[in-house]
Regions:
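Phosphate-binding site recognition
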Residues: 1-347
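A cross-kingdom feature that marks ATP-driven nucleic-acid transaction machinery
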Residues: 312, 318, 323-493
Length: 493
């Protein structure tokens, strides 16, 4: 476990990974220049933001204030109590947040002091003018001019936190740090769950993703002992109504501050989980017109539950994907059997859901992991540095069909030049791949060349969780443009 940190501030040993985040926070919090500065830390709940910021405040002798859903008056009293603990001396009455921010900035004139306000959206809900107050005190003539306070605003309500620095928001242009704490990448997640078997790692990640709190807090360190223990683990954890993880996917949607019609939003997520990835397909599934779901789609994107992925080969086309694996698992496996699951019938339901789990959960998720592999790959894997990684559809008019490219890797765009294709890839989780998959990718490569893409030197990649036929393996040895990626390669450092 790395203990990397900023100059003179090693990362605490109890923090797993997060080296880059720690270095960024330490660099911001120890900046000795005069003038209060602002940092914004966001990310979905349970990613370890509070854990990270508490460690920072403790390491640097700063202030950590966890806000609650309370009135302004009560929040100010609690904030005053925190200031008293920090200063170890009386604090004058704080009539409002103007007094509070001015007093706070006056505490740290001699050396930089990190001040963390966690769950900041709770304070904004009760005191909508607070961002404007902070903006004024950070500005010319404000109390922050002679201060060295390093104010860090943190929150999990992504729509609120994203809006703090957007458009005409008061704090736009004021932040010296904007840090989003993401889930662990798939390789880090495997290490976090102490899983060395790559097949088990994929199955595990397809259920819980890279959210650290699911293991530490919601499951009390319960993880599958080996591949044979995966099915029993699913039954005793995520399908067990006695565990907090059982209802977690429902709570994730409830956190969205703009969500007024939960049934519509759940239906949109169910549509995507069922494979309806376009706005038209989603609208048809939920029984609404396309223009009636544009707002729910935007809100789900703002909440980081959905992502909109452009088709790399068809301009203006895009598909939607669920970001949080647990939500996909819930919509595909749990929602339709919720009443029986609450009665403790998880074992029977799980055994009857294996086909759906493989096709709707693991298959699409494995494709996403392969795209993540491509994003992180060295330039020699594709014959050049990836500029954009995604998926796309290539129309084959002659054969009246479409070729879906699961992992498309494009070189960085160059003005005045055709877009260069580095690699076209197909992904199969539970199927042995053979030469016909290569032939389909080569057909797509030829079609893209006709459409104006630069496909010279473009490689074909086959990604498989079940292996490759002997014929395909032999072809790889004689054909330099064929590349096979198995689970061991996917998880190799």
């Amino acid at each position: 476990m790395s203990t990397a940190g900023g100059p003179g501030v090693p990362k605490p040993s109890h923090l797993f990974d997060r080296d880059a985040e720690w270095q960024g926070l330490v660099s911001f919090a120890t900046d000795a220049r005069v003038g209060a500065t602002l940092g914004v830390v966001s990310g979905r709940r349970r990613q370890g933001k509070s854990y990270l910021l508490q460690a920072l405040a403790e390491a640097l002798g700063g202030i950590y204030f966890p806000a609650l859903q309370l009135t302004e008056a009560v929040s100010l009293r609690l904030f005053t109590d925190e200031l008293i603990r920090f200063t170890r001396s009386p604090v004058p009455p704080l009539r409002d947040w103007i007094d509070a921010i001015k007093f706070l900035f006056g505490l740290s004139k001699d050396h930089p002091v990190p001040v963390v306000i966690d769950e900041f959206p709770f304070l904004v809900s009760a005191s909508p003018s607070l961002p404007s107050i902070i903006q004024r005190e950070l500005g010319p003539g404000g109390s922050g001019r002679d201060s060295r306070a390093r104010l860090l605003l943190c929150g999990s309500a992504m729509s609120v936190m994203g809006g703090l620095l957007a458009g005409h928001a008061p704090l736009r242009g004021r932040a010296g740090l904007e840090l989003i704490v993401h889930p662990f990448g798939y390789r880090d997640a495997a290490r976090f769950w102490e899983t060395s078997d790559p097949k088990l790692a994929v199955l595990l990640h397809s259920v819980v993703g890279g959210t650290p709190a699911y293991r530490r807090e919601l499951l009390r360190e319960d993880s599958p002992a080996d591949l044979a223990d995966f099915d029993p683990w699913v039954i005793r954890t995520v399908l067990n109504p006695q565990t907090p993880l059982f209802r977690e996917a429902r709570y994730l949607l409830a956190e969205g501050t703009e969500i007024r019609d939960p049934s519509l939003y759940q239906s949109v997520l169910a549509a995507v989980a069922e494979g309806n990835a376009t706005s038209g397909g989603i609208a048809s599934y939920v029984g609404r017109k396309s223009n009636e779901i544009s707002h729910p789609l935007r809100v789900l994107e703002d909440c980081r539950l959905l992502s909109r992925q452009p088709d790399l080969f068809r301009s203006g086309r895009a598909t939607y994907r669920i970001v949080e694996p647990l939500v996909t698992f819930y919509q595909s496996i749990m929602s339709r059997e919720w009443a029986r699951l609450e009665l403790g019938d998880g074992r029977m339901i799980w055994h009857g859901s294996q086909g759906r789990f493989l096709s709707q959960v693991v298959g699409p998720h494995f494709e996403a992991l392969c795209r993540e592999y491509a994003i992180r790959a060295n330039s020699d894997v594709f014959g050049g540095p990836p500029g954009e990684v995604g998926s796309g559809v290539v129309a084959d008019s002659a054969n009246r069909t479409r070729i879906e490219i699961d992992v498309a890797v494009l070189a960085p765009a160059e003005h005045g030049h055709p877009r260069r294709v580095l690699s076209l890839g197909e992904v199969k989780w539970d199927r042995v791949m053979d030469v016909q998959h290569v032939e389909r990718l080569r057909r797509a490569r030829d079609l893209l060349a006709v459409k104006g893409f630069d496909t010279r030197g473009a490689r074909v990649h086959c990604y498989s969780g079940a292996g490759f036929s002997s014929e395909l393996q032999s072809a790889q040895h004689t054909d330099a443009d064929i590349h096979l990626v198995d689970l061991d390669q996917l998880y190799a450092d």
